Structures are given as structure tokens and as C-alpha cells.
A protein has these predicted regions:
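Beta-turn initiation residues at beta-strand->coil junctions
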Residues: 5-11, 30-37, 69-74, 91-97, ...
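A motif-centric feature for acidic-aromatic and gly/ser/thr-rich catalytic loops and repeats
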Residues: 51, 92, 99-167
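Short, hydrophobic/aromatic-rich segments at coil-to-beta transitions
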Residues: 64-69, 88, 152-155
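Acidic/polar residues at beta-strand termini and the immediately following turn/coil
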Residues: 23, 70-72, 83, 123, ...
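Aromatic-rich beta-strand edge motifs centered on tyrosine
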Residues: 1-2, 17-27, 40-51, 57-66, ...
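Short, surface-exposed beta-strand/loop "edge" segments at domain boundaries and coil↔beta transitions
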Residues: 39-40, 75-79, 98-102
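Short, flexible loop/turn elements at secondary-structure junctions
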Residues: 10, 85, 158-160
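Residues that act as N-cap/strand-start positions at coil-to-secondary-structure junctions
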Residues: 14, 54, 73-75, 103-104, ...
Length: 167
């Protein structure tokens, strides 16, 4: 059983509908927020990975069972792990295009505890970008995005946190 649709009711009374797609191995390969008043169909959505009929579409690229990349409308995040046999993240390479149309690349580093949970994220110069505290089973207790630009989606090893649904 896989999550193919999530309806999120906001405090202001509005509703967002997110749809998810998976490959034959059960790995999530896409997620996107539907434009207002569209319906999700398991057979028709969202096979068009070019972003048609979607707002905020994300694609996922895998190397075996390792999440290799997330491709967002505003750029791409590539993940590097400590070892090919480990799910402990080491670094994140962010490629994006700035407002002037120039390509930019940032490298950020994960600082994990003894069981591979990211506790901090720093930039290439060692400046703190993000830090988090967790409950016993990997649920995020609290986080601080120091710069407001850090993106850290990992929890326990090989667990991806979907911010839209909280899963």
C-alpha cells in the first residue's frame, strides 16, 4: 500500500491536494500539488513528469535504495552518502539558477550522530545552517533553520520526511 493522494486542510479553511507516484520497486519518483479542483486518478496522474497540471512538482532519482536526487522547480539537490553501503548522508549538492539566470552550486554537509541521524548541517565554510532535535524513534522534536535557506529532509537512516503530510 502506497500513499497516492493526500488532502491537507489548512487553518485558513483552504485545502491542498498532493499526489504521489512510485516506480515498480516501490520507490517514490514524483510528488506534486494539484492545481485547484483537479481529481487524482491512479491511472492518469501524474505520469506527465514535465509538470503539466501541477504546481510545485518534485521528481526523485534513485541509485538502488539510496535517494540520489530531488529535482524541484527551483533547482536540484544531489545527495552523497558516507559509504556505498550506508544510508548516512554526508553532503548535499544544490544546483539552482539565480534571479539573474546564472547557475549556482552550493555544497552543504550533514553532521550525524552515532546512529546516522542528521543533527546539524553546515556550509562549505563550516557555518551552521540547520540543526534539529529528535524524539526516540526519529520524529523531529524541533529544528532551527538558521539561514532560512537550508533544506534537510532526512530523519533516521534512509527515512525521508515529507513536509506536506508530516510523514
Amino acid at each position: 500500500d502506497q500513499l497516492v493522494k493526500a488532502e491537507i486542510f489548512k487553518r485558513d479553511g483552504t485545502k491542498e491536494t498532493w499526489a504521489y507516484t512510485y516506480d515498480a520497486l516501490g520507490r517514490r519518483i514524483g510528488k506534486g500539488r494539484l492545481k485547484t479542483n483537479q481529481e487524482v486518478s491512479e491511472t492518469s496522474f501524474p505520469h506527465d513528469l514535465s509538470g503539466n497540471d501541477l504546481e510545485n512538482h518534485t521528481r526523485f532519482v534513485w541509485d538502488g535504495s539510496h535517494l540520489l536526487q530531488e529535482i524541484h522547480p527551483d533547482g536540484r539537490y544531489t545527495y552523497i552518502y558516507t559509504d556505498q553501503d550506508s544510508y548516512e548522508p554526508l553532503a548535499q549538492v544544490r544546483n539552482r539558477t539565480d534571479r539573474e539566470g546564472e547557475s549556482k552550486q552550493e555544497i552543504n554537509y550533514f553532521h550525524c550522530d552515532q546512529i546516522g541521524i542528521p543533527r546539524e548541517m553546515t556550509d562549505k565554510d563550516g557555518n551552521l545552517l540547520w540543526f534539529g532535535n529528535y524524539y526516540g524513534w526519529g520524529k523531529l522534536k524541533g529544528e532551527t533553520n538558521v539561514t532560512g535557506t537550508a533544506y534537510q529532509p532526512f530523519r533516521l537512516q534512509n527515512q525521508y520526511a515529507d513536509r506536506e503530510t508530516g510523514l
